[in-house]
Regions:
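Nucleotide/pyrophosphate-binding catalytic subdomain
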Residues: 1-216, 384-389, 401, 405
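Conserved dinucleotide-binding and phosphotransfer motif residues
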Residues: 32, 88, 222, 286, ...
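Glycine-rich beta-alpha junction loops
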Residues: 43, 175-177, 222-226, 230-235, ...
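Conserved beta-strand termini and adjacent loop/short-helix elements that scaffold enzyme active sites
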Residues: 95-97, 229-231, 293
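Short hydrophobic alpha-helical runs that function as membrane-insertion/retention elements
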Residues: 168-172, 226-228, 291, 373
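A conserved regulatory-domain signal marking ACT and ACT-like small-molecule sensing domains
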Residues: 237-408
Length: 408
């Protein structure tokens, strides 16, 4: 009998009516001849409220105790979902990550899955039960509760689908699929019927909030078909698959916007082996995640200019770090450009089509939008633009590539 894994996010189980709606979806899948595993997030904003409570009690709560606290949110929701299914007359059982055999490393609040023992789940499924698993959590080898970090319930669902060799992993959320852009910012955005794992991974890494990149990576690695659809309607969603049909015929599949970026530039660094390594080692030690790294060498070959982007940090903190780096590594001077946003276009068709960059930059030029940095990869072109121009830039590139017209 085929196995279906269904994941329900916090908004999809935010209250009793939505919990009953999720329960009915699981029962429907069971009656269609499937064995059903549900992965459920904490209700609504429960995780945020629990985190706030922790910081009211302690200025620096232990990560281990944070995991103990945050994991309770999912335990509430899985029990309520099991009750709703039982109320409808069907057998169901709720399990925590530890009870389901989801083993992780010991990196509290950012744990990574090491293995899943599926024996208990399979036994329960063979008994005809719907199994409801708490997302976002696991247990390490010393039986400490761990949590998987941002997007943890998505990761739980895809990992379970892979371990169980499920027919599909269905992600139920408050949107009805993956769009060519955020429809709140681009009213002309269209829903995609299918998208490749590579394209979805890039979109998720660059601001698309439908799914977390880590779960997409798992789906790609283990060949898990992922269906993203609304928990509130029966509208067809989006299928994320290894190779989308006509993948290279569509040049650009989607566009994204990320806010809150800054650009740090160090001028006149000595052009010596190990300089860049030392700079980024210092940044790593301060837990600063950087990207869009660029280095240019001066005409005399003696000095280099090194620049990189940073997201989500206070300007004062960045200035202090930049000054420290400039002093330590003997930079001539440095600059910080804050209040930037990143606009990206993603499409597997870029591999075989020419003129993508020209069309993107032409659209931005027509809107008189300044470009502060350009970064490219095989299927992505990203630009940094002034934050006040960000939405206009997103709308311009979306229109330039016909994403308001193209269905995929």
């Amino acid at each position: 009998m085929p196995i279906i894994v269904q994941k329900f996010g916090g908004t999809s189980v935010a209250d009793a009516p939505r919990i009953h709606l999720a329960a009915r979806r699981a029962v429907r899948a069971l009656l269609d001849g499937n064995q059903v595993v549900m992965v459920v997030s904490a209700m609504g904003n429960t995780t945020d409220r629990l985190a706030q409570l922790a910081y009211q009690v302690s200025r620096r709560p232990s990560k281990r105790e944070l995991d103990m606290l945050l994991a309770t949110g999912e335990q509430v929701s899985v029990a309520l979902v099991a009750m709703a299914i039982q109320e409808a007359g069907y057998e169901a059982i709720s399990l925590t990550g530890a009870q389901v055999g989801l083993l992780t490393d010991s990196a509290h609040t950012t744990a990574r899955i090491q293995s899943i023992d599926t024996a208990r789940i399979r036994r329960l499924l063979d008994q005809g039960r719907i199994v409801i698993v708490a997302g976002f959590q696991g247990v390490d080898r010393d039986f400490n509760i761990t949590t998987l970090g941002r997007g943890g319930s998505d990761t739980t669902a895809v990992a379970l689908a892979a371990a169980l060799r499920a027919q599909a992993c269905e992600i139920y959320t408050d949107v009805d699929g993956v769009y060519t852009a955020d429809p709140r910012l681009v009213p002309a955005a269209r829903k995609l019927e299918r998208i490749s794992c590579d394209e979805m991974l890039e979109l998720a890494s660059r601001g698309a909030q439908v799914m977390h990149a880590r779960s997409i990576e798992l789906g790609k690695k283990f060949g898990v078909p992922i269906h993203v659809q609304s928990s509130l309607t029966d509208s067809p969603g989006t299928i994320i698959m290894d190779q989308a049909p006509g993948m290279e015929e569509v040049v650009v599949r989607g566009a994204t916007l990320e806010r809150g970026l800054a650009r740090v530039t160090l001028f006149g660094l000595p052009n010596e082996p190990g300089t860049a390594a030392a700079v980024f080692d210092e940044l790593a030690g301060r837990a600063l995640s950087v990207d869009d790294i660029a280095q240019t060498v001066a005409a005399d070959g003696r000095q280099v200019t090194l620049s990189f982007s940073v997201q989500g940090h206070e300007e004062g903190e960045l200035r202090a770090v930049a000054e420290l780096l400039a002093q330590r590594f003997h930079a001539v001077h440095h600059s910080i450009n804050t209040d930037l946003a990143r606009v990206s276009v993603v499409g597997a068709g870029m591999r075989t089509h020419h003129g993508v960059a020209a069309r993107m930059f032409g659209a931005l030029a027509a809107e008189k939008i300044r470009v502060d940095n350009i970064a490219t990869s095989e299927i992505v072109i990203s630009v940094l633009v002034p934050a006040p121009d960000a939405e206009r830039a997103l709308q311009a590139v979306h229109k330039a590539f016909g994403l308001d017209r193209t269905t995929s």
